[in-house]
Design a protein with these regions (language model features):
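Short beta->alpha transition motifs characteristic of CBS
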Residues: 256-259, 350-351, 393, 410-416
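Extended extracellular/luminal ectodomain segments enriched in beta-structured repeat modules
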Residues: 107-114
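Serine endopeptidase catalytic core focused on the charge-relay Asp
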Residues: 158-384
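Short, surface-exposed beta-strand/strand-loop-strand elements in extracellular ectodomains
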Residues: 121-136
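Catalytic nucleophile loop of clan PA
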Residues: 240-251, 389-411
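A short, polar/charged loop-to-alpha-helix boundary motif
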Residues: 417-421
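Protease-domain processing segments flanking chymotrypsin-fold serine proteases, especially trypsin-like
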Residues: 22-101, 145-243
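Gram-negative bacterial Sec-dependent N-terminal signal peptides
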Residues: 1-21
């Protein structure tokens, strides 16, 4: 058997709020709760794209890439602001007037959409909502708590080819709102949300092992530290949260340099937590190589670039916001010792798929990238072959753990796949 080598290293209407003068923002879109319908809602439609052609383009690129990064969406540059289309509707009971603006964004044929706002500042008491045209999918409200020094906001994906952007804001605060949509990202690979078109999915190999399987029982804490993430609304990789010597709970997130995070685009990072199948699919089965049932509804958005190095292929960012306790994120330990005498475990998201786990029972080797010669001063750790599971495009940046459950590197590249461990 050939042994694959792996190297780690958003019309305006005036409404009233029953919570008069409260600074609390609305928890759901007022346009949906008011019983009022908005006629002639502004719509912006993107030019149609050929999803199959985009996937074929990427397949050619990935076939020759030694450092594969999975692209799942095509960015479309736009410039959309809520400076027009402000219309008033009759107010309802209460004393404080709220204003609502919304518009529909469509990209025909998209399997998913996500949005990038290069200008975002939400005054206290206001909220931005992004939801599907049917109203069935809705991202949590973005409020003043999401204001950051870099002034940007990037959203997680929503399934389908149309979304509605809605702003609810106290009318006396409208002049302070800053909002500019600059990127509509047309998903052509898909996601594992339930109503994605199954025939368009690029699925991970059947030999992969779901983290919910018994094989992952000894790694439950470490599994909670690993996330799939997107940058620029178009590229997917994997990364992990690390503890630090101050034990202060900061969100230091480790991934691969070749995944392309820089100081200029770190604000666009969106991490997805607990994106996992709900049951163990038997490794090697058609079920394991098929569509999963994981959800992409637990996320952090935005980060600050802290460090990176191309030779060892690492990037470290600090996530903008604290972790939501409901997401149960774990901060993994790490081991920077030069001497390695350990088996290894990889936890990762292959091909934008639910989280998987892989095992190497033999000792890993310290070496350099593109070399198989042992080198105690090398920049990389080599996994000669996986004994259970594998890694694939999308796994890049995922952590490699030693036998003591400490991170010793992140996935750089290699030729592993089902049948080529």
């Amino acid at each position: 058997m050939y042994k694959g080598i792996l190297k780690y290293t958003t019309i305006m209407m005036a409404l009233a709020s029953a919570s008069v003068f409260s600074a609390q923002p609305p928890s759901s879109p007022m346009s949906l709760n008011s019983g009022q319908t908005l006629q002639n809602m502004p719509q912006v439609t993107m030019q149609a794209m050929d999803n199959a052609a985009l996937r074929e383009r990427d397949a050619r690129r990935l076939a020759s890439a030694s450092e594969p990064v999975l692209q799942f969406a095509e960015p479309i540059a736009v410039s959309i602001t809520p400076e027009a289309d402000w219309t008033s509707l009759p107010t309802i009971q209460g004393e404080r007037s709220y204003s609502v603006w919304r518009t529909k964004i469509s990209s025909p044929g998209a399997l998913s959409l996500n949005l990038g706002f290069e200008e975002f500042y939400m005054p206290e008491g206001g909220a931005l909502f992004v939801y599907s045209a049917s109203g069935e999918q809705m991202i949590r409200p973005f409020t003043a708590k999401d204001n950051e020094d870099h002034g940007q906001l990037w959203t997680p994906m929503i399934t389908g080819d149309a979304v509605i952007i809605e702003v609810n804001i106290p009318s006396d605060k409208v002049e302070f709102l800053r909002l500019k949509l600059t990127s509509v990202n047309h998903g052509y690979v898909g996601s594992d949300l339930q109503d994605v078109f199954l025939e368009s999915r690029i699925m991970s190999g059947s030999c992969n092992v779901d983290v919910v399987c018994p094989a992952g029982d000894d790694w439950r804490q470490q599994i909670r530290s690993v996330a799939a993430y997107s940058t620029g609304g178009s590229l997917f990789c994997t990364g992990s949260v690390l503890n630090n010597t101050a034990n202060d709970g900061k969100g230091y997130f480790l991934t691969a340099d070749h995944c392309g995070i820089t100081a200029s685009n770190a604000a666009s990072l969106v991490t997805y937590w607990n994106f996992e199948n709900s049951y163990c699919r038997e490794p090697g089965s058609g079920d394991s190589g098929g569509n999963g049932d994981g959800q992409l509804n637990q996320f952090n958005t935005g980060a600050i670039f802290r460090a990176g190095n191309s030779s060892s292929d690492f990037t470290l960012v600090e996530l903008d916001d604290p972790f939501d306790p409901a997401h149960n994120v774990y901060l993994s330990g790490w081991n920077a010792n030069a001497t390695l005498n350990t088996s290894a475990v990889g936890i990762h998201h292959p091909n934008v798929d639910e989280k998987r786990i892989s095992f190497e029972n033999d000792n890993v080797v310290r070496t350099n990238y593109s070399s198989s010669t042992p080198n105690n001063n090398g920049t990389h750790v080599q996994v000669i072959d996986w004994d259970l599971g594998t890694t694939e495009p999308g796994s890049s940046g995922s952590p490699l753990f030693d036998q003591n459950k400490r991170v010793i590197g992140q996935l750089h590249g290699g030729s592993a796949a089902c049948g080529n461990d």
